[in-house]
Curated annotation (Swiss-Prot):
Keywords: Cell inner membrane, Cell membrane, Ion transport, Membrane, NAD, Potassium, Potassium transport, Repeat, Transport. The lineage of its organism: Bacteria, Pseudomonadati, Pseudomonadota, Gammaproteobacteria, Oceanospirillales. GO terms for cellular component: plasma membrane. NAD(+) 2 binds at residues 233-261. The gene is trkA. This is Trk system potassium uptake protein TrkA. It is a peripheral membrane protein. Its main location: membrane. It comes from Halomonas elongata (strain ATCC 33173 / DSM 2581 / NBRC 15536 / NCIMB 2198 / 1H9).
Amino acid sequence: MKIIILGAGQVGGTLAEHLAREENDITVVDTDADRLRELHTRLDIRTVAGAGSYPMVLRQAGCEDADMLIAVTNTDEVNMIACQVAHTLFRTPTKIARVRATAYLTRKGLFAHEAVPIDVLISPEQVVTDHIRRLIEHPGALQVLEFTGGLVQLVAVKAYYGGPLVGQELGFLRRHMPSVDTRVAAIYRRNRPIIPRGDTVIEADDEVFFIAARRDIRAVMSELRRLERDFRRVVIVGGGNIGERLAEHLEHSHQVKIVEHNLERCTQLSERLDRTVVLHGSATSKRLLEEENIEDCDIFCALTNDDEVNIMSSMLAKRMGAKKVLTLINNAAYVDLVQGGEIDIAISPQQATIGSLLTHVRRGDIVNVHSLRRGAAEAIEAIAHGDTQSSKVVGRAIGDIDLPSGTTIGAVVRGKEVLIAHDDVVVESGDHVILFVIDKRRIRDVERLFQVGLTFF
């Protein structure tokens, strides 16, 4: 696939890295020649220096015969104009744009072929807000991913010493919980992936990814770790787009406080939010945290654009008694360094956004992609089509499907029915199949499984 990426920042660069590994023809456009040189040295891609919204630059990048344009520069207007130019002058089939400003996102009908012709709109702030919201709804989870409109969830938790399932084989799970159907999709032990089998033994400190119907998630979590009580008192640092959206979602069911250093922004937040307490000050101030009784806080969310402020305020809050801290970290290289110590959960907004973009690049009928483990693994939702002669999955029991190495099927969703992927479950045409792929090099093989052909014999 020939893809043009506008913007060589964190998202654009990471996306180029993902797609270049998958044998795509990638061209990256940016005004920063130094950044382009760095990418070109590392990756097998073309680069073009220039403004991504200029027709001549798009032509130079190969827009005349490109399959897809992905506009992820830091400027909404550049992204929108680039999609308009690509549509009007080059008839580019698929145009994806990152748009941050709520002023654009709330205008119905703005993004349509007869208006601003963007086929797929990505709002990083909304993606990250939804990600944090799910973590707050599931205390103790490291990740919570949704599939098929929320019917199925894939949850990552850390197994704890003394947990009912620690030291037990996975086959014990079904016998121990006969009324709850679940499947362990993957285990990470000391950062190394393990493909689970019935005789795999769960060890303390394993990071366990399990899949279940939404209604059964808490029951399964209770077997792997101590269930934490629901979060009620939430402190948000940073009143930007993410902080405001999260507060707006939580304020009617939680006690929410926002700490914001900009006085004008504080005034805006106090006018827009109904029940949220808005505090003017610095979250790195020990005095402010003491005055707000930070030791009573159930979860402290540091969501500013400044990694240093987020990390330092989180560490301070944790030392002063906050029960859980969640930290937004824009520099992806820092995520592994800080998570697991005083910072309970570190979130990379770039990594969260990448999955939304990859969903629209995958071959076959792939409707949902989540990038995991800093891009090393993926969770995929694919729709099975065809029949026993044209499909490699339809009409076959899961135990008989020739899955690529390192790939597991976690669940099959048929209409509103959730079928956990035991070996005797037979896939039907139209089923949504949830897969976990621990090795990104196998993604193409997974896509081929769900591509319908005249025959595959």
